[in-house]
């Protein structure tokens, strides 16, 4: 849904999201939610957001086929790395810069045995893992006002913040700004 600033400036919504429940190789349901918000300053930010959520869902679908699948920080890094590879390859293919596909990136993966939360940039995640609602990761801002971090930034992996819980999420909300 386009926000009020999109309506005023007559620009399309550049956000993308995906929420689904799949089964792991052992038959365990896994909830996956991915949200990306294309940078307004990026010429193809909306496309970047769309690719980010699609690439994440694709890699996750492959990962959950393994009996050794686990929710951990390494999985978050692998997801972000895969998204970056896809965006950088598309930029090169189109003769553009990866920055042209800049977007924020948020994700939640939840099973009955654990929950993984990950974020680069602004937007927000609110979860309840049994102790009431909480914001597990403070939304990021950049060095100056109205700045944030993007999955295409050179330091994206180092600014990625993750939070792992050893229990299932009772309630989840993931949203862009």
Spans of model-derived segments:
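PP2C/PPM-type serine/threonine phosphatase catalytic domain
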Residues: 1-176
């Amino acid at each position: 849904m386009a926000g009020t600033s999109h309506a005023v400036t007559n620009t399309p919504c550049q956000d993308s999201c995906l929420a689904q429940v799949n089964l792991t190789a052992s038959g365990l349901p896994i909830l996956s939610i991915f949200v990306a918000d294309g940078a307004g300053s990026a010429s193809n930010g909306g496309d970047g957001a769309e690719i980010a959520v699609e690439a994440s869902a694709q890699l996750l679908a492959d990962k959950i086929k393994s009996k050794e699948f686990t929710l951990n920080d390494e999985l978050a890094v692998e997801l972000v790395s895969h998204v970056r590879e896809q965006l950088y390859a598309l930029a090169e293919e189109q003769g553009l810069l990866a920055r042209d596909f800049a977007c924020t990136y948020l994700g939640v993966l939840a099973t009955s045995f654990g929950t993984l939360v990950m974020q680069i940039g602004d937007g927000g995640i609110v979860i309840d893992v049994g102790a009431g609602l909480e914001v597990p990761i403070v939304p990021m801002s950049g060095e100056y006002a109205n700045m944030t971090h993007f999955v295409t930034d050179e330091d994206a992996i180092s600014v990625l913040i993750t939070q792992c819980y050893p229990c299932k999420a009772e309630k989840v909300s993931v949203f862009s700004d």
